């Protein structure tokens, strides 16, 4: 991944155990081809909305390229809340006749910081988690869910999607979907190497149990 902008967008980059967030617009190439020059103000609105969320939740923007963001958070709970807030901000914006859906992936772990850039498997894993999501969906690893548990409760929860194979990641990764008021919960199987296998009734029942635990 090529990063065009670094240095936290005015914020110091956190170190140690860091929560990483990757996001991008689903079908951005199709939108560009359809909208032409009208895509530029759409992209500008997208960036403005999300940058406001990152700043509100103490996120450090590591980089952006086109319609994607790479953001680091010192507290995984802030990353989880930021992902929720981002989807709410996007859903509440008037996009006219265009549908703009953003996929978000989260992972928390140790990463090396050198010359205002991160290296390590934690970064790559977060990017792969984002790539597995659908527009409007927030996926997070078990590590991020556990470390950011204080963000979860009556209004924000997770649904266990089980283990998945992600491209270039040697081991299966346990993934969760962020759930809560205002967040979509009806998505196709994840875009993973081995797609999530369940039946709709089981998935609905699992979501109901997750919400009941949150209440």
Regions found by a protein language model. Name each.
Residues 1-15, 179-215:
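Intrinsically disordered or compositionally simple regulatory linkers and C-terminal tails
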Residues 2, 47, 152, 156, ...:
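Generic secondary-structure transition motif, activating predominantly at the C-termini of alpha-helices
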Residues 2-82, 88-89:
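Catalytic NTP-binding/metal-coordinating core of nucleotidyl cyclase/transferase enzymes
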Residues 5, 41-42, 155, 160, ...:
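Acidic/proline-rich low-complexity IDRs
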Residues 28, 113, 183-185:
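Short, acidic Gly/Pro/Ser/Thr-rich loop/turn segments
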Residues 35, 93, 155, 190-193, ...:
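Low-complexity, intrinsically disordered/propeptide-like segments
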Residues 51, 70-180:
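Catalytic beta-strand-to-alpha-helix segment of the class III nucleotidyl cyclase homology domain
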Residues 54-60, 138-145, 173-180, 193-202, ...:
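Low-complexity, flexible helical/coil segments
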């Amino acid at each position: 991944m090529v990063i065009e902008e670094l240095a936290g967008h005015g914020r110091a980059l956190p170190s140690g155990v860091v929560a990483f967030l990757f996001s991008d617009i689903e079908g951005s190439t199709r939108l560009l081809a359809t909208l032409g020059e009208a895509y530029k103000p759409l992209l500008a609105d997208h960036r403005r909305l999300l940058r406001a969320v990152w700043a509100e939740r103490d996120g450090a923007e590591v980089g952006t390229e086109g319609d994607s963001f790479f953001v680091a958070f010192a507290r995984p709970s802030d990353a989880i809340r930021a992902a929720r807030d981002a989807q709410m901000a996007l859903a509440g914006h008037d996009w006219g006749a265009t549908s703009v859906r953003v996929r978000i992936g989260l992972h928390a772990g140790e990463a090396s910081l050198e010359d205002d850039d991160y290296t390590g498997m934690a970064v790559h894993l977060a990017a792969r988690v984002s790539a597995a999501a659908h527009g409007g969906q927030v996926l997070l690893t078990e590590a991020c869910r556990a470390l950011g548990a204080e963000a979860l409760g009556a209004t924000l929860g997770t649904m266990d999607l089980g283990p998945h194979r992600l491209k270039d990641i040697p081991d299966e990764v346990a993934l969760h979907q962020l759930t809560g008021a205002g967040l979509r919960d009806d998505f196709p199987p994840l875009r993973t190497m081995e797609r999530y296998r369940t039946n709709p009734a089981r998935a609905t029942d699992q979501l109901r149990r997750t919400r009941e635990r949150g209440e």
